[in-house]
């Protein structure tokens, strides 16, 4: 361990987030008191942060802020709740209750699929929170540890029934998720009214003050990188033999968030550290998490994530500590490669001769509006489907394990409700975070602007004869990275209302960070620049060259090789 760095860190004052965790009594705080408080619809003091460990964020409708302020009213507080759903798999019949709750108990009546393979509700009033937790519990689900300084929802390559390997990988995602969960009984006591029976508690893996920052994990089956592994803290890349997983390549330290203007923050790709046999999976997971727990920076949250810890101590030192704690020697990385990270839309036959139908859900927003009857369509499918729904890391949904007798019925519903539609490859490979009106961190629109923006970009691509090509396009309303714009070929990151930084030069498979091309420009200015770039790409690319590769080859931006030094240069 770098003793000099350790001394500097320990001499600094811990962040207030650390005080909150230390004093929380294992995430209880005074949340139960706030639930009884009818004067405000929000949570107060430390509880505002603590509810995140229970899977909720306090938000307000930013479209109404000024109006409510003028009326001397508090903001329209409501909670966003995110379900824990490792691998994104849920029984179709369970969807019936999820749909019912969204319709009856949320302000917006929608369900949002996320790029972390789960769903979330927006607009839950405080008085309805216990109802949603009890509803989730009744169908075997919860929202524990889907936010704040813990291991978040574990991702897994989609459609695990496509092969025995997919099913095995999904089971590992579940095992890792359960293994790294907080042990506190606070969630059950507060939301499910279970009596406290344990007088002393311990968190053997996460510790009393949990992790320094959020921590994200994936399980990946090459050649598909649909989970965007390079954006995650801890990754298990499956190595197989005879249709069985025999081990994992381990990659650590990925992450995309940064702060505008703060050159001490930067995105970073997860880095290979070695190979393990499958029986060492949980011990390695524990070693990585506890090393980050103990070595991570608790004095500066902007530099608290795993990638900064590795940068501070050095990759070799971090790796040695993992091996020491796990009592495992990491072997050389085994060969693997990726060919894409998009979803495969349409029907696919699985290992049991059943069918899976992958549906494109733009921005993951499930709602009903005019010809888009996504919500009622999925409800109709859930009523007749005996299998699963599988949420993908691209915010789409797979109707899986469809029997031959139900295949035509489900297809008819999907067609009539607009769930099967003719979308361009550009649109199908786009993504946006939620942003306005509910995200308190949003600087610019994302989800609400994306569809119209894509339509204009589609017209440009049509004009230059590349309308069928794939370009990875992503929009984030702020630099926190939720929309994964910094793994896109074209990435927009909000700077202020109507203005974005334009990043270009990422690649198709998601292992190159794009670089800023233009700063603080409007949507129309972005389209002007992209029109020129797409025209040039159409005329000068070599051998069906991807857009991002062309951008780097022609040096419209310099390739980001080590973002610690060249992301900002």
Swiss-Prot record:
Q: Record's InterPro entries? A: CysI, NiRdtase/SiRdtase_haem-b_fer, Nit/Sulf_reduc_fer-like_dom_sf, NO2/SO3_Rdtase_4Fe4S_dom, NO2/SO3_Rdtase_4Fe4S_prot, NO2/SO3_Rdtase_4Fe4S_sf, NO2/SO3_Rdtase_FeS/sirohaem_BS
Q: Keyword Cell membrane, does the record have it?
A: no
Query: Where exactly are the transmembrane stretches of this chain?
Result: none
EC id: 1.8.1.2
- Partners and quaternary state? Alpha(8)-beta(8). The alpha component is a flavoprotein, the beta component is a hemoprotein.
Family annotation (NCBIfam families): CysI (TIGR02041), PRK13504.1 (NF010029)
Q: What is this protein called?
A: Sulfite reductase [NADPH] hemoprotein beta-component
Q: Which organism is it from?
A: Buchnera aphidicola subsp. Acyrthosiphon pisum (strain APS) (Acyrthosiphon pisum symbiotic bacterium)
> Which gene is this protein's source?
cysI
